[in-house]
Amino acid sequence: MAIKLEDKKAIVAEVNEAAKAGLSAVVADARGVTVGAMTGLRKEAREAGVYVKVVRNTLLKRAVEGTQFDVLNDVFKGPTLIAFSNEHPGAAARLFKEFAKGQDKFEIKAAAFEGKYLAANQIDVLASLPTRDEGIAQLMSVIQGATSKLARTLAAIRDQKEAAAA
């Protein structure tokens, strides 16, 4: 079924806005995935702050033109499902990676982050990025560990001086 020119322009504009706002993008082939599974993926994507859309390749190429995601143009072949992470760079990669575990036919093609192309085997790097809250928690544990070590060292010095004075 042919799409009207106005509809094509609207799709390109919508995807372009998502691309401009996106921190990272992941491209996948969802051939053979059931409608129920795709609905579940879209629901999880909304909750994770990820924009997910199936778009024709020619429209997708126009939509990402001039953005940091135009490095993905070569993988826009066949049915293309694209996801843009809006809140955390690893959200879309993590979402697709988890979804692919339960779907044999779901294939992650590639990703882009900060204008760099990531092949399908490099998705784990993007998916393993800690979220903002996880990063803060890691930083706080490092700071807490350092301060407790300092407190123990100062207590040991105090005990040594008290023992030497006695």
Curated annotation (Swiss-Prot):
The keyword Ribosomal protein applies. Keywords: Ribonucleoprotein, Ribosomal protein, RNA-binding, rRNA-binding. GO terms for biological process: translation. GO terms for cellular component: large ribosomal subunit. The keyword Ribosomal protein applies. It comes from the Bacteria. PROSITE patterns: RIBOSOMAL_L10. Gene3D superfamilies: 3.30.70.1730, 6.10.250.2350. GO terms for molecular function: large ribosomal subunit rRNA binding; structural constituent of ribosome. Pfam families: Ribosomal_L10 (PF00466). Belongs to the universal ribosomal protein uL10 family. PANTHER family: 39S RIBOSOMAL PROTEIN L10, MITOCHONDRIAL. Forms part of the ribosomal stalk, playing a central role in the interaction of the ribosome with GTP-bound translation factors. Part of the ribosomal stalk of the 50S ribosomal subunit. The N-terminus interacts with L11 and the large rRNA to form the base of the stalk. The C-terminus forms an elongated spine to which L12 dimers bind in a sequential fashion forming a multimeric L10(L12)X complex. This is Large ribosomal subunit protein uL10. It comes from Ectopseudomonas mendocina (strain ymp) (Pseudomonas mendocina).
